[in-house]
Amino acid sequence: MRYTFGIVTVYLLAGCAGSPPKPPEVKGKYRPINRVEAPASAGRNPVNSLNALCGNLNEKQCR
């Protein structure tokens, strides 16, 4: 009981020291460098796009 305050203080300080720093602020225009391009197979056909999104579901379940 005598050392409770000291132990709690040490745990709090160690927890704050182990936390990661804040990421840097974005200045200017944000451009992601590792962007994954979308597959062109779906194209502009809404039926193909719908099937690509729904996977194995039939059309009534998806809509």
Swiss-Prot record:
It comes from the Bacteria. It is a lipid-anchor. The keyword Kinase does not apply. A lipid is attached at C16 (N-palmitoyl cysteine). Keywords: Cell inner membrane, Cell membrane, Lipoprotein, Membrane, Palmitate, Plasmid, Signal. Residues 1-15 form the signal peptide. It is found in: Cell inner membrane. A lipid is attached at C16 (S-diacylglycerol cysteine). GO terms for cellular component: plasma membrane. To B.suis ORF12 in VirB region. This is Putative conjugal transfer lipoprotein XF_a0011.1. It comes from Xylella fastidiosa (strain 9a5c). The lineage of its organism: Bacteria, Pseudomonadati, Pseudomonadota, Gammaproteobacteria, Lysobacterales.
